[in-house]
Amino acid sequence: MVRYMVTAALPYANGPIHAGHLAGAYLPADIFVRYLRLKGEDVVFICGTDEHGTPISFRALNEKRSPREIVDEFHEHIKTAFQRVKISFDYFGRTELPVHYRLSQEFFLKALENGYLVKKVTKQAYCEHDKRFLPDRFVIGTCPYCGAENQRGDQCEVCGRPLTPEILIEPRCAFCKNPITFRESTHYYIKMQEFEEKLKEWIKEKDWKPNVKNMVLGWIEEGLEERAITRDLDWGIPVPLDEEDMKNKVLYVWFEAPIGYISLTIEYFKRIGKPNEWKKYWLNLDGQTRVIHFIGKDNIPFHAIFWPAFLMAYGKYKDEEVEAEWNLPYDIPANEYLTLEGKKFSTSRNWAIWIHEFLDVFPADYLRYYLTSIMPETRDSDFSFAEFKTKINEELVNVLGNFVYRALTFVNRYFDGIVPERGELDELDRQALEEIEKTFEEVGKLIREYRFKDALKKVMNLAGFGNRYFDYKEPWKTIKEDKTRTGTTINISLQIVKALGILLEPFLPDASEKIWHFLNLEEVKTWRFTELPAGHKVRKPEILFKKASDDQIIYFILNYMGRNNPDAARELLEKYYKLEDVEKVAIEKFGEEDGRFMLKKIFKEKYKGEKKGEQKMQYVSFEEFSKIDLRIGKIVEVQDHPNADKLYVVKVDLGGEIRTLVAGLKKYYKPEELLNRYVVIVANLEPKKLRGVESQGMLLAADDGEKVALLMPDKEVKLGAKVR
């Protein structure tokens, strides 16, 4: 039986993770693994924080803290963020574990023993001002390949090419910004050229994504050169040699980080009491293991060229039980880049969607759904707040959530929550059941091909089919004439609901669990669909998804982007919203004083910031005012708005005429406080649909910015009486 060793790129423990990281490596890996588990496959999903990279040292120096403090903080931060967004690692560890130190040093010594390392005296970047050697990331300059400025000395973020400080144009110290010099230093290099032909032949045989395979073969064709695997740095894994010129030197993180996949697997099986089980996944014992690395575009050369070379350089692993070659990567389904509103994510400018912040405002399933629907599988894609809102509301809420709620509400209302017997099937009924089977087959195939965006679309197509089936069958009509026919419709609708509960598990695990709960199922989900039996009792449903609102998006931009990067917040807010709408949210969420202070910080001179009551009075003529028809009415019914959290739908008696009004009073009045109240309404206001419900007038109320109070006559008067 094939077994899967699935990894996701080890995130640097120097800061939080953002939506670009999630869409690039972690969400696709999680979808793939969740599907394999549903299929009953043998799969282990491993990840952990990379805790020795120069980004950690860089942040520690900037913040005058120790690297240990930095990695301890962000290991927990990143781990929690992954848990909140429901990334289901079997184990999430860290490269500061002793097993990782031991294994990394072992890889170094084996490569040295096998003749693949060479010691060289070379010139290393050195800052005369700060009196220290500079790791590649501590050097910035212009990329010689694409001309991008302010690129680090290890890799160009624009074209993705590996770099060294020596080839940068006008290299400078990243801290003091002074030009650097180069001093002699002794280091070990791996002879990458010795693996060139073997790597080329190995990669040519792979059925990898074209964007990965073509990029890697292109680099190899240009020729591989010796690359340093030790460096002058005081934070990292010490070089395991008692040599004078190796004192105070550590293993290069790009050498030891991928070894973390193995060391973390060893740690995982040790913790679950199976200390030798890791060998089945990392050693080629029977040819049945598929090692799959999910990464972002910037990690392709390290995983597809250098990492396989390290495994080859080690040679055979041998202990008292086994002797075998290492498993080389079976597949590397790297994704391209995710941009934000047309621009590259920038952590330094806070031009990013940080996962922990986004989940403070929106559910995890919303982020998972949107990112999967735009996943940059073969080309770059863009995160747009407008598109996010549209996709959530028009697809997740109106299609998927609507169908599940309709089917479950109907069976509870007309069949006491009991799955009805199925009568004779017509052509559409049979087509519905065929759609279920076809969707499972197609979605599974697409997931195995790493086409997660198309797979999710197929799932949503089934939900859309369910809605169309329900509409065509019109059970709300047939229930009055033919309960048996209606029972068949509802039975099949519930089969689609159950199918969705399974199909959504890889993509939207929270929604999947809710559907399973609504269906009152205790069986373990599997990819093999079995029907709900007639007579099974289901629960009453709740709303599966609530609409994403402009207020939520404004709040997110204000509270998170606005605090650290006011210019970025202003750019987004001006792109989508009127200033008065932003002001309303700011004052509602942060209070009068703090809200206006925040708006002045973001909009500067564009925001005048008058408090309520301070605005200059604007007059209307008596003729204009006399056009307004104000009437006395009585509230006779109060209902929650079906599509909005802050609105009521109220019915007002104007004396022989009942008007339906939409009122934003939910925050200020309970339904029972409004019922039977006399109110003043604008009776000749043009009707307008508010969130799908037509409002035939407007209630009048006083608003001081904190409290809202309805205007009411101080004694009972005839309903419909004019206010003059």
Swiss-Prot record:
A motif ('HIGH' region) lies at residues 11-21. It catalyses: tRNA(Met) + L-methionine + ATP = L-methionyl-tRNA(Met) + AMP + diphosphate. It is an enzyme of class 6 (ligase). CDD domains: Anticodon_Ia_Met, MetRS_core, tRNA_bind_EcMetRS_like. A motif ('KMSKS' region) lies at residues 344-348. Zn(2+) binds at C143, C146, C156, C159. Pfam families: Anticodon_3 (PF19303), tRNA-synt_1g (PF09334), tRNA_bind (PF01588). ATP binds at T347. Its EC number is 6.1.1.10. GO terms for molecular function: ATP binding; metal ion binding; methionine-tRNA ligase activity; tRNA binding. Residues 624-724 form the tRNA-binding domain. Homodimer. HAMAP family: Met_tRNA_synth_type1 (MF_00098). This is Methionine--tRNA ligase. It comes from Pyrococcus furiosus (strain ATCC 43587 / DSM 3638 / JCM 8422 / Vc1).
